[in-house]
Amino acid sequence: MKKRGFYNLKHPFDPCPFEFFCSGTWKPVEYMRIEDGMMTIRLLENGYVLEDIRPFQRLRLRSRKAALSDCICFLRPDIDVCVLYRIHEDDLEPVWVDARIVSIERKPHESECSCKINVRIYIDQGCIGSEKQRINRDSVVIGLNQISILQKFYKEQSTDQFYRWRFSEDCTSLMKTRLSLGKFLPDLSWLTVTSTLKSIVFQIRTVQTKMVYQIVTDEEGSSSTLSSMNITLEDGVSLSKVVKFNPADILDDSQDLEIKQETDYYQEEDEVVELRRSKRRNVRPDIYTGCDYEPDTIDGWVRMMPYQFGKCAVNVESDEDEDDNNEDGDTNDDLYIPLSRLFIKKKKTNSREAKPKSRKGEIVVIDKRRVHGFGRKERKSELSVIPFTPVFEPIPLEQFGLNANSFGGGGSFSRSQYFDETEKYRSKGMKYGKKMTEMEEMMEADLCWKGPNQVKSFQKRTSRSSRSVAPKTEDSDEPRVYKKVTLSAGAYNKLIDTYMNNIESTIAAKDEPTSVVDQWEELKKTNFAFKLHGDMEKNLSEDGEGETSENEMLWREMELCLASSYILDDNEVRVDNEAFEKARSGCEHDYRLEEEIGMCCRLCGHVGSEIKDVSAPFAEHKKWTIETKHIEEDDIKTKLSHKEAQTKDFSMISDSSEMLAAEESDNVWALIPKLKRKLHVHQRRAFEFLWRNVAGSVEPSLMDPTSGNIGGCVISHSPGAGKTFLIIAFLTSYLKLFPGKRPLVLAPKTTLYTWYKEFIKWEIPVPVHLIHGRRTYCTFKQNKTVQFNGVPKPSRDVMHVLDCLEKIQKWHAHPSVLVMGYTSFTTLMREDSKFAHRKYMAKVLRESPGLLVLDEGHNPRSTKSRLRKALMKVGTDLRILLSGTLFQNNFCEYFNTLCLARPKFIHEVLMELDQKFKTNHGVNKAPHLLENRARKLFLDIIAKKIDASVGDERLQGLNMLKNMTNGFIDNYEGSGSGSGDALPGLQIYTLVMNSTDIQHKILTKLQDVIKTYFGYPLEVELQITLAAIHPWLVTSSNCCTKFFNPQELSEIGKLKHDAKKGSKVMFVLNLIFRVVKREKILIFCHNIAPIRMFTELFENIFRWQRGREILTLTGDLELFERGRVIDKFEEPGNPSRVLLASITACAEGISLTAASRVIMLDSEWNPSKTKQAIARAFRPGQQKVVYVYQLLSRGTLEEDKYRRTTWKEWVSCMIFSEEFVADPSLWQAEKIEDDILREIVGEDKVKSFHMIMKNEKASTG
């Protein structure tokens, strides 16, 4: 009995076989007429006849209406369909247009399909012959009843029947619907030539759901018999054949198909058909695939867990191997869960020598690698991509209904027993009724379809379907690859529950935390024992040296000299015998900086850090702002000389060079003796500041975790001052005293790469678990794919979920750090998720963190931000917020940032400003109501006083703010970007540019438009920003038609390649021409269009190549791609000369010290963005003087933005400075100290520069 086809791709023809695109829609065509070599078509609508039609344009087979089975088996993302949609709002009726499916929101099918299908409408409709077509960015939601499936001719055609084509076939691509493809075009050519030579009229039409080439005669009206022509091929020659037929005697194919399907469906109950593995891609069949309970009746079949067991192996393959082996694989994003926990962590061993140990209740993994493909891998930087290392730990098989003890019959299951049984079974010819081994029966019992005839299904299952698709080799250890299967819904839930239960058991198994004093005493004992052991070894070695005779010492010295003469060059440092012996016995290194080597021990010559890893030393004479609120004065011990004490100004905060870090052995510095030497002065003070705020004191005996004075704090150090390394050092020491606290580090996507490199660079012993975002994880999985042989292969989404759960479990099991991006955190914290594991991970992230670290914590500062709301729900008050630019735009955002870092700040503000709240000792209200109340008081009292024009009132507001915040804010304002005087220097110039004639005309028109609005409309601001760079850029915006007519846009469009029409463009080209041979240039821009334009200009003018001399860094690049671009630009000797970067994509957390010239093409509303962008180049590691050019267009909105930005920067300085800050207008001076800039200005003949000012406050050289 034949099996019933669940889905059929071929379909009978519609009564109207073709459709034609006209009047903005696809209209059905009754027939195509060929007469005298001319083709005409007749439309079904009103019987219109269109003459001289070419079959290559706007004509195709008619699309068929989608059915319920299409939603189940055919429709998927990235296929083209025809949809019924109202293009314009003023249209009376919807029209049929082509579109592409973006995504499908699946819903259960009951009486009809209720799935929501997101599609994008093509812009160029009817152009099915074009290879490249434009498509709308915005998607629309439609239903199944609005979709038609595209059709093409079936590959088989008739040669001896009255019809030429019997079926059409479903088509997924718009390109493949062309009639010029396949065998229809030669037929059409034959009919056209025949109609001319023989004067015969043909009609291509549908007769009883079949397409015929009908011959039109005068006798058709009087006779029921029709004539058609068919074409046959004999000996390579096409011959025509005329066939007469009666339409009434022909059976409709649609009825034929229904009868056939009904016949195929009712099979004999004794016949058990083997499970057919679907060959479709990206589709899940709409069948019942799992059940967690026993069915009420025995009728029908229930799919159980489809496990196939063989020699299980984990193969790491390249992308090409994955594509070849997975040609029919399922890449849907639905949750297909593997038995990944059945595998042991992969080890790098030889496949022929791998002998894994036998374990009870586990399946042994044999590691195999494919040898082919050598030489195809490109060499990549080790740190350019964050590696993905999947780790799978074994889970007992009993959790999935498999009895591991039954394998082999003994108490344990060995690899040899398993493979001996399988080889014995496979070596025999498998026939029906053959007796199976006990192990095979167990496997079949777990793999079977449960039903009334399951015993017969065992006997009638063929051995071919259960065997490997790979041929058997002589090597018995060679792994076998089985056909891919997927887990049922019940197995998926069990696996997820197992992971979550593991986390719960890990949390429950944690012992009660010991007191800080007990933990400290235990650490001291451990360190004392280790030190005592080292001293004993040292004494023994010294005793041995004393007993050595003088002759032996001479011989040893001579051997060392001989070896040195062969190994060392004359200019290398030679290590004496005493230092060599000290190094062998465990030298207490005293590192000194050697400019050619790095951090080198002066005792034994050991190199601690190479010169490439050594940061430039920070200057000591920097202002250090720290208050003593909630901190005892006795905790800060200073050592001042007599002269310094006499000259100290008590109205100012103590100089950082005057306050030295505590050196007592009974404090937290004893926890990180090696890292302490690598911290700069300001970092050491911040280290103690963190301990006082988070734990209460630097001395463990004085720490009280229940104290009300401890809480969140802010590290506001200048960009590039080493905040990341400071936090790494603090976490290393913190976890030693508080191992039960689970630190969670959240960072922007761009800085995750920096965090990862820092942990590797400093060799931190604390385990770090990095949770990738979904897209980044899938990209890593493509680069290094893990293939599961013989078990269900998971989808990428499932692998990501398992990876997150596994890392969270390890985070709970051992003292470690969990690092993730803000985007991933927001995704996992969604409360409206329908998946139980998502809700569980959100619960864990809210309740488990004992310490929350927020890198670049000023980003989630909006009151309505979903990220900020999620962060406020994390149940810990111990938080550390890192920011180089704490004050952003206004005091409302500043208040939100402080509340995020220190939730107690809300109560502190209310106690200080709300007399009613202070009298009642707090009011029991909802947290968000208290926050709104505190925010209102903060803005009405403090912010208004600081914004006031009266100096005394402003000073009063600043003092109130400092009294409330200085206790938990540690501010470090180094020179320039915080890198200190050791850096070569920084010069910042503001260039006010005169516009060209065409620029002036455009900008004047746009400035007049602004006067009609209240505020600054975004569209007008965008147009002004683009026009100030180059006039042609206004045409790159979609809103340009609102301000310019078509004639003006046409004239502007001709200026694209004329660089002289833009004053900023001319300055960039002049600067690059003068410095390109010896310096690299970093160009920041807010929009993408200028980046693309400059790329084309550099290619045309300098003959550079994109990706070689020209590099771009924009927001659409994934994390690992950004890392590659940064490493390429920073690599010494790389041919890259210019990096065009989006200021939003790389303004924070990355190092671009290869550039010594920075150009800011447009101004920003937020001064912190400009400051962060400058800090990408002016930071530790910079070897040259950095020149920054801020370009402004005279008399435009850019000048207003610059003045507003300067005021915000002044307010920020007033908040964090103890001294009076001068008027910001005095920061600028009209002078030029840059030789290159002076040369450009001297040669300027068109007077492009209106004013050039140097920022004296921000510049250091």
UniProtKB/Swiss-Prot annotation:
**Where in the cell does this protein reside?**
Nucleus
Q: What is this protein called?
A: SNF2 domain-containing protein CLASSY 2
GO biological process terms on file? gene silencing by siRNA-directed DNA methylation
What family classification does the UniProt entry report for this protein?
Answer: Belongs to the helicase family.
Q: Which UniProt keywords apply?
A: ATP-binding, Helicase, Hydrolase, Nucleotide-binding, Nucleus
Q: Which domain of life is it from?
A: Eukaryota
Segments carrying motif DEAH box: 855-858
The job of this chain, per UniProt, is described as: Probable chromatin remodeling factor.
How this chain assembles, per its entry, is: Interacts with NRPD1 and SHH1.
State the encoding gene: CLSY2
Keyword Nucleus present in the record's keywords: the answer is yes
Taking every annotated instance into account, which residue ranges of this chain make up the domain Helicase ATP-binding?
704-904
Q: Where is this region: Disordered?
A: 458-479
InterPro entries cross-referenced by the UniProt entry: CLSY/DRD1 (IPR044567), Helicase_ATP-bd (IPR014001), Helicase_C-like (IPR001650), P-loop_NTPase (IPR027417), SNF2-like_sf (IPR038718), SNF2/RAD54-like_C (IPR049730), SNF2_N (IPR000330)
One Pfam family it belongs to: SNF2-rel_dom
Q: Which organism is it from?
A: Arabidopsis thaliana
Which molecular-function annotations from GO does this UniProt entry contain? ATP binding; helicase activity; hydrolase activity
- Please tell me where ATP binds in this chain: 717-724
